[in-house]
Every structure is written in C-alpha cells, then in structure tokens.
From Swiss-Prot:
It comes from Influenza A virus (strain A/Swine/Ontario/2/1981 H1N1). This is Nucleoprotein. The gene is NP. Keywords: Capsid protein, Helical capsid protein, Host nucleus, Host-virus interaction, Ribonucleoprotein, RNA-binding, Viral nucleoprotein, Viral penetration into host nucleus, Virion, Virus entry into host cell. Signal peptide: none annotated. Late in virus-infected cells, may be cleaved from a 56-kDa protein to a 53-kDa protein by a cellular caspase. This cleavage might be a marker for the onset of apoptosis in infected cells or have a specific function in virus host interaction.
Amino acid sequence: MASQGTKRSYEQMETGGERQDATEIRASVGRMIGGIGRFYIQMCTELKLSDYEGRLIQNSITIERMVLSAFDERRNKYLEEHPSAGKDPKKTGGPIYRRVDGKWMRELILYDKEEIRRVWRQANNGEDATAGLTHIMIWHSNLNDATYQRTRALVRTGMDPRMCSLMQGSTLPRRSGAAGAAVKGVGTIAMELIRMIKRGINDRNFWRGENGRRTRIAYERMCNILKGKFQTAAQRAMMDQVRESRNPGNAEIEDLIFLARSALILRGSVAHKSCLPACVYGLAVASGHDFEREGYSLVGIDPFKLLQNSQVFSLIRPNENPAHKSQLVWMACHSAAFEDLRVSGFIRGKKVVPRGKLSTRGVQIASNENVEAMDSSTLELRSRYWAIRTRSGGNTNQQKASAGQISVQPTFSVQRNLPFERATVMAAFIGNNEGRTSDMRIEIIRMMESAKPEDLSFQGRGVFELSDEKATNPIVPSFDMNNEGSYFFGDNAEEYDN
C-alpha cells in the first residue's frame, strides 16, 4: 500500500485520535482498554459477582451487551417513540450466571440505562469513550464470525455461500465508525451496498428528497470505503463507476457481486485486531496493571501476553468439548475466523480443527436452556507464538482449497502460500463480461488468471517467541500445503440469526 501516509493507523481510528506517534497511540489505546477494565470491575461490584463469576465469559458478554444497549442512541429513541408491550425503553439487562450450592443458576437482571452510562463514563474519566464501545462491538463481531456462517445472508443478496471468507464484520452495527469499517470484509460492504440498491429499486422515494440526499451520501461513502479496500486499479475504477451511477440498479448489483468474487483471488485490505472480552481487561486492571502507562496495541504482542496469564471460564453444555469451546474463543479473540487453519494452529501451538468438526455450539446460552445441567471449565486461550496482525490481504497464488470456503483472509502477517481453488473461483466468471465495464472486467479476470502459485505472501514475515517482545527474531514456519486450511470447510455451523 503506497498510500500508507494518508491513512490513519487503526489504533488512531480506534481511539478517534488525530495523527499521533507510536507512543501516543499506545497510550490512547491503553486508556481505552483500561476504561473497559475499570467499567467491568465496577459492574461486577454492583452485581455482587464473585471472582469466579466475574471470570465467566457469559457474564462478561451480558455486561458488554448492556453497555452497548445503553449507548445505542438510535434504538433508544426508537423504543421510546414506539413503545412495545412489556419492554421498558429505559432499562436494559440480560442473564447473569451465579454459582449456588455447587450448581449454576441463571438470574435475569434489569438495569437503568442511565445508571450504566454513569458507571461507564465514570470508568472513562467522565467521557463517553465511544472508542471503547466500538472495541466491544468488534469483539462481539469477531465472536460471531467464528461461531456462525452467513450462507443465508449471502444467498439472499445473490452472492455465493463459498464467499464466506469475505464476510468479516457482517454483524457489526452501522454505528461502529471508522474502526468498524476497517475490519469489515469486502463481502460485508458489498452486501450492505446491494441491500441499499435493492431498497432503491423497490422504493421510488429511497433516493429522493432530503432523506434521499442523506442516503446518497451514505451510499457514496460506503462505495469509497469498499474502493479503499481494493488493491488493484481495475477494481478501484469499477468501484468509481458503481459510486457515480445516477440511478443504482441491477447493473451495479452485478458489478458488486463480480468485485466481491474477484476479491477471493485479488484480496482486499481488511484490518484485524485482537479484541478480548471485557472480563480479561477487568482482571488485568484489578491485578494492578496500568494500561495507559504501559501502553497497549491491538495488533502486536500485548493481547497475547494478556491471554497468557488470564483465566477465563465458560459454561459448557453436557455434550460439548471444552477444548473445542476454547478454540472457538481463541479464534474470536484474534479475529482469526477466516485465517488459514495451519497458520492459526502453528501460532496457537495446538491443532486447530475446521468448524464442522467442532463439538461446540456458540458461547451464548439461550434462555430456554437448562443451566443446572451445565458445568464450567477453563478456556485455554494461551498461544505458543505470537504474530503481528495484518491489514492487507497479502498477494496471491494458487493452492488447493476446499468445497466449503474457497479462499482465506489472512489475519496474521506470516509468510505462506495463500490457498484458493482457481478452478472453482474462475468458473464463476465464465461468460459474464457484458456491459459497460467489460474492459475492466477483462482486466480483473486476466489478473486473477495470472495469479501465480509460487508467490509467497508476507515474504520473510514470521511468528515470534512470546519472550521476543520487540519482534527481532522471526521464525518462518513451513506448512504442509496438502492439508486442508479452511475453517468453514464442508460446514455445518449454525446460521447467524439476529
């Protein structure tokens, strides 16, 4: 990316900061993380959670969801204007799990949103600290990415379910700002645009009037975000055309689907950050760690070090495998749902198995499940090595890939071949280069066809020992390229239903 100079780093996006040097960025990210930790400790006190209960990931998620709900201005306004029976728009809550007489019990709690906002602001030096809220949203998004597949959503917008590696961040709310946009995959943004265009086709007034003007601005902004993720001139030129269209319709939808497919080989830049559950930050703050003074980075060694010495528990359903539950949460913590399993496994120091072979469902527990039958176990979130998270798609080459997911979106900046099944991807392009963008389409297809098998991505980049904090001695792993590398291969993951 030659244009690096014009971009803010993700940490700056994350903290809403202007240009800062590395030390300032580390300090402001640290301030954000410390605020989340202080908030979590205060909530545990208010809810009278024991130390053990405070380390339960399900409790962490409930507390996180409560603060997100308390600050969701739009929804709060909507709820007040459209009162629904039995819902108090001023309150938020969820299940809290407590250990009573050797058994887990579920307790549904309700809290004033105003009270939660007060605790949050108090933990964040009186500020709204939107960066911290976005950080929590990204953690939830990463957890969804590792837990569910989005086949139905892909099919509904006319995309191919095998394009799931492009769907990072597909459950992130619109209000997640620049930091949220940075972690969204090409397919996610293409899908948001397709939905807008479809509404415009069905509703004559969608682009008209004062509202329509705002809609148009949002449309063009989203086009620019997607354009910025592409790394080739032809893909970007095609995005310009989609953006400039007077009256977006089926031609634009076709172009977007074409571009999304092309990203399976000509990968887009998608940021990856390790966002951990609030209880992990709470534990560190409680043990006296000063995040702001020490500084923190979401893309370096810090999250790995934090997870090395945090003990987090999870409720386990009777037929679930605790090791598999740990893998799911580990992948979510490092935003590695679409990473090559061989790379993840090498870094983690344990075999990482595809989603279809995991004996575990999601982390959250439905209100109709019987909690008393459940046990809790420690999540194994430690790693053998650490690696720098990437914000680029890496260059491409050809490898055997799978029947389910046919490409990867790298998370870790580690030298490897990037697998994709050229025959499968290219089959989708046959005979579809009609229309006004034909020359760009031809150019993109030509680039895809000439993507070389032997090109290594992230040349010379490796993983590091956990003692190597300054990343001085890269270890470049060698991978067995005959093994399956896709997580959603031949998959039976549950669908994400909001």
